[in-house]
From Swiss-Prot:
The gene is apaG. One of its GO terms (biological process) is error-free translesion synthesis. This is Protein ApaG. It comes from the Bacteria. Residues 2-126 form the ApaG domain. It comes from Vibrio campbellii (strain ATCC BAA-1116).
Amino acid sequence: MDVIQPCIKIQVHTKYIEEQSNPELQRYVFAYVITIKNLSQQTVQLISRRWLITDSNGKQMTVEGEGVVGQQPFISGSDEYTYSSGTALETPVGVMQGHYILLDEKGNEFITEIDPFRLAIPNVLN
């Protein structure tokens, strides 16, 4: 499996979901919206994902599975795919990172890394 970074660009936006959170019970819920941009001219298919989620206490959780939000989307050349999902932490600050495994038009698998991104309630410095 090859790592081919330049052809895929990942953009992430996060938001704290206060109405689903309960700080007294150490439950902090975050939503994230991810846009996967295919910068190549060929169609790719996202077949699986792997996340490493770390809270500010150092507690880690790994999430792996097929596709994203129940789909294994095809992303045409110069097109993009956007989806939203969420996670809950026991602390008000955390970090997510991971990778997607994709297929090119020839059926070759490749990995696209997802750089670490911060999950934090507003106005937290940690």
